[in-house]
């Protein structure tokens, strides 16, 4: 959540939708945050269920179908905005998680979150990250993300926001063609803040070149 009540109103000066990502360590944390955001000028809520569930020994909400469904139901009861459930790739079968949040009443899903990785400092002979493990993002995870978006698109009937290693229009189009209704750019923005604009322009160029009148023609065209 934003650290100040001034942050969200500040963003309203821009002609775009505002999506707030919500994290928590317990169901109560999520519910409390969502209730507070109900009074803010926010368009959509993205619920990050990759967070560890303290009451369940630290297992992420998004790794247990019953927990994912329960947190979705709890959030939907109090949410005043549409709810997007952000799915973790660190599971045996991501379609089971997608089905769980769909059953819980989610309005959409976003995927994938970061993969869990580890880095060792060989000179100091210790972990390079204080938490021992950390999220891996960027181009390396893109093929995995495309595969999971494809799987989820064929398993549920909710809109999908595809993400994971998108740097170019081609990367974004891959996501769209396997079923994503929208895409998100994360890590690439740290290298080039104009990445998102370049991706949008690139998609438009592709559509013009290939005589695609409506991007909906591309959503899920690869099955």
Language model features with spans:
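Structural signal for hydrophobic packing residues in well-ordered secondary-structure cores
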Residues: 15, 38-41, 76-79, 203-207, ...
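C-terminal helical cap(s) of enzyme catalytic domains, especially alpha/beta-barrels
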Residues: 120-134, 176, 188-213
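Short Gly/Pro-enriched loop/turn and capping motifs at secondary-structure junctions
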Residues: 166-168, 190-191
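A short, charged, Gly/Pro-tolerant segment at domain boundaries
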Residues: 216-223
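Short, small-residue-biased leader/transition segments that mark boundaries at the very start
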Residues: 1-3
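Alpha/beta enzyme core
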Residues: 25-161, 167-185
């Amino acid at each position: 959540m934003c650290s100040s009540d001034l942050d969200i109103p500040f963003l309203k000066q821009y002609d775009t939708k505002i999506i707030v990502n919500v994290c928590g360590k317990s169901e109560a944390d999520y519910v409390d945050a969502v209730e507070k955001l109900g009074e803010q000028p926010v368009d959509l809520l993205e619920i990050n269920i990759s967070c560890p569930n303290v009451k369940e020994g630290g297992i992420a909400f998004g790794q247990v179908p019953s927990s994912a469904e329960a947190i979705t139901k709890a959030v939907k009861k109090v949410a005043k905005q549409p709810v997007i459930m952000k799915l973790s790739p660190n599971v045996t079968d991501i379609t089971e998680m997608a089905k769980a949040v769909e059953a819980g009443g989610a309005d959409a899903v976003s995927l994938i979150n970061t993969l869990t990785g580890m880095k060792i400092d060989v000179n100091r002979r210790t972990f390079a990250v204080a938490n021992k493990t950390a999220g891996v993002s960027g181009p390396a995870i893109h093929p995995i993300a495309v595969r999971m978006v494809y799987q989820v698109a064929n398993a549920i009937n909710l809109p999908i926001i595809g993400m994971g290693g998108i740097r170019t229009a081609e990367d974004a189009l891959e996501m769209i063609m396997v079923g994503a209704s929208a895409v998100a750019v994360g890590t690439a923005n740290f290298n080039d803040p104009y990445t998102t604009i370049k991706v949008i322009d690139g998609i438009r160029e592709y559509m013009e070149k290939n005589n695609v009148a409506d991007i909906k023609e591309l959503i899920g065209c690869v099955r």
